[in-house]
Regions:
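Membrane-penetrating hydrophobic segments
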Residues: 1-12
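Beta-strand-turn-beta hairpins that frame and shape the catalytic cleft
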Residues: 39-51, 174-175, 181-193, 219, ...
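Active-site neighborhood of phospho(di)ester-bond hydrolases with catalytic His/Asp-centered motifs
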Residues: 51-54, 79-85, 107-114, 177-179, ...
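Core catalytic region of metal-dependent phosphoesterases/phosphodiesterases
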Residues: 64-185
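Short beta-strand/loop segments at the ligand-binding rim of alpha/beta enzyme cores
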Residues: 212-223
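Conserved beta-sheet core of the metallophosphoesterase superfamily
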Residues: 227-321, 328
Length: 328
C-alpha cells in the first residue's frame, strides 16, 4: 500500500474522529434560540409570544445548559409551554426548579414525557434506525385518573420522582395539561389548551379531553410530548389551531442537505423539527398541500438527550420563541 493510500486512510480516520468529537462535545452544548412567527390568531388579535421548551433531560451537573436556559427568562415571554422529558436523573428536580426559576414566574403549561416517569438507560444508538421506533413503547396501561403508571415506588431505581416534579411545577402556577383541558388569559388573549399524557408510552387518553374547540376563545392549542399521528389527527380534527410537541430531538443526527433520518415516532422526518402544517390524515403529505384550515404544528428539537447517547450533528439543541400573530 503506497503513501497516498495511507495518507487518505489517515485523513479519513482523522475526519471521522473530529466529527465524532464535535457531535459529542461541541454541538450538544451549542444551544440555539429559534424565533418563529406563527399566523394562527384571529384578525384583530394582538400578537403573543410563547416560549417552547422541550426535552431538557436534565442532570444537575449540566452547568452550561442550566445557565443558558436561565437566561431565557430575559426574553419575557407571555407564556411558556414545556412539552416534557425534563429529567435524566432522580436528583434533578431541585436543579430543574432552579434552572427554570425566572420562567416559573411567567404563565406556563406542561405535559409529561417518558423521561419524567422513567430514568434513561443505555441503548444502542443504531436501534433508533429500525422501524420499531415508529411505534409506541408498551410499558403497561396507564392508571385511570393518575399520571402514567401512578405513584413511583421510592425503591425502584428505574422510576423518576414524578410527583415531586408535578408539585414543583404546579406549585409555581404552571398548568398541568396531562390528559387535561385548561383556559388561560395571556396578553389579553383567551387561550384554550388541550393536552395528553405521553403517547410514546401509550399513556395518552384523548377521550378524556376530546371535544370541539371552544367558540369563545381566540385560539385552541394542542400540547403533547410525542407527536404521534393519532394524537395530532384528533386534536386538529377538534379544531386546535396550533399543535406543540417535542420528543423527536429533531432526529438528533441530521444529514446536511437532507435532514433527519428518524423521529422516534410515526411522524414523517420532514416534520422532525420546526414549523409545518397538520390536518387529519396528513400523514407524509407536504405542508405545501395543506388545506386552508390546517393547524400549525411546531416540533422542538429539544435542549438535551439521553445522557448515554448525547450525540448531535447538524441539529443543535434549541428553545423556540413562537410569536403568534393574526392569520394572513
Amino acid at each position: 500500500m503506497d503513501r497516498r493510500v495511507w495518507g487518505a486512510l489517515g485523513t479519513g480516520a482523522g475526519l471521522a474522529a473530529a466529527g465524532a468529537a464535535y457531535a459529542t462535545w461541541v454541538e450538544p452544548r451549542w444551544f440555539a434560540l429559534r424565533r418563529v412567527e406563527v399566523p394562527c390568531l384571529p384578525s384583530r388579535a394582538t400578537s403573543v409570544r410563547v416560549l417552547h421548551l422541550s426535552d431538557l433531560h436534565l442532570v444537575p451537573r449540566q452547568r452550561v445548559k442550566r445557565a443558558w436556559v436561565r437566561r431565557l427568562a430575559d426574553l419575557r415571554p407571555d407564556l411558556v409551554v414545556d412539552t416534557g422529558d425534563n429529567l435524566a436523573a432522580r436528583d434533578a428536580v431541585p436543579a430543574l426548579v432552579d434552572t427554570l426559576d425566572g420562567l416559573l414566574d411567567v404563565p406556563g403549561a406542561f405535559v409529561l414525557g417518558s423521561n419524567d416517569y422513567f430514568a434513561p438507560g443505555l441503548k444502542n444508538p443504531l436501534r433508533y434506525l429500525d422501524d420499531s421506533h415508529d411505534r409506541p413503547v408498551r410499558t403497561g396501561a396507564a392508571t385511570p385518573g393518575q399520571h402514567g403508571p401512578g405513584p413511583a415506588d421510592p425503591t425502584d431505581r428505574g422510576r423518576l420522582p414524578t410527583e415531586e416534579l408535578l408539585e414543583a411545577l404546579t406549585g409555581r402556577g404552571w398548568v398541568d395539561l396531562t390528559n387535561a383541558r385548561a383556559r388561560l388569559e395571556v396578553a389579553g388573549l383567551r387561550l384554550e389548551l388541550v393536552g395528553v399524557d405521553d403517547p410514546h408510552l401509550e399513556y395518552d387518553d384523548y377521550g378524556v379531553v376530546a371535544g370541539p374547540a371552544a367558540d369563545d376563545v381566540d385560539l385552541t392549542i394542542g400540547v403533547t410530548h410525542a407527536p404521534y399521528r393519532r394524537v395530532l389527527d384528533a386534536m386538529s380534527r377538534d379544531g386546535a389551531g396550533l399543535l406543540i410537541a417535542g420528543h423527536t430531538h429533531g432526529g438528533q443526527l441530521q444529514v446536511p442537505g437532507y435532514g433527519a433520518l428518524v423521529t422516534n415516532c410515526d411522524l414523517d422526518t420532514a416534520r422532525a423539527s420546526g414549523l409545518s402544517r397538520w390536518w387529519p390524515g396528513a400523514g407524509s403529505t407536504p405542508s405545501a398541500e395543506a388545506p386552508d384550515d390546517a393547524a400549525w404544528l411546531h416540533v422542538s428539537a429539544g435542549l438535551g438527550g439521553n445522557p448515554y447517547t448525547p450525540f448531535r450533528f447538524s441539529c443543535r439543541p434549541e428553545a423556540t420563541l413562537l410569536t403568534l400573530v393574526p392569520a394572513r
